[in-house]
Amino acid sequence: MENNLQVNIFCIQKSDEFKTWSEKYSKLISKYATLKEINVFNKKIALAQNLNAIEAKKSYEEAFMPYKKGYCIALDEKGKDLTSIEFAKLIQDKNELSFFIGGAYGLREEFNQSLDFRLSLSKLTLAHQFVKTLLLEQIYRAFCINNNHPYHK
């Protein structure tokens, strides 16, 4: 199978506590697409998070701006709820997908609105580290749906 699709995941995160699970799904996704995971965390974000939510969200946005390319999706609890089949349709036939996972304070409304789509994985507030792992599983599931693989039953 030819891997023409580029999938990018950008996350405000120091380290990956769910590394074993992330690696599992990253390997599975590689059968369908080239995957790039970038944990974005710098001194400005660390300082801003200690100031307030507004400054933190601004620092997240500044860190993410250079990566806005392809079909851009924000992970946001106020985003649209999709079934796995609907998500598979959403990402089907795209050349490049870029997913943005904010830090502890989420993302600014203006940033979310500047992207192509806002996706909610749950109405619950989830740890951003966990969101990334859950997103990887759903991306793999979507590829399986789109390729008639039995993983999704």
UniProtKB/Swiss-Prot annotation:
Superkingdom, natural source: Bacteria
Coiled coil feature spans: none
Localization (cell): Cytoplasm
An MF annotation (GO) of this entry: rRNA (pseudouridine-N3-)-methyltransferase activity
Catalytic reactions on record: pseudouridine(1915) in 23S rRNA + S-adenosyl-L-methionine = N(3)-methylpseudouridine(1915) in 23S rRNA + S-adenosyl-L-homocysteine + H(+)
CDD domains attached to this UniProt entry: RlmH-like
UniProt family annotation: Belongs to the RNA methyltransferase RlmH family.
Name of the protein this chain belongs to: Ribosomal RNA large subunit methyltransferase H
Originating organism: Campylobacter jejuni (strain RM1221)
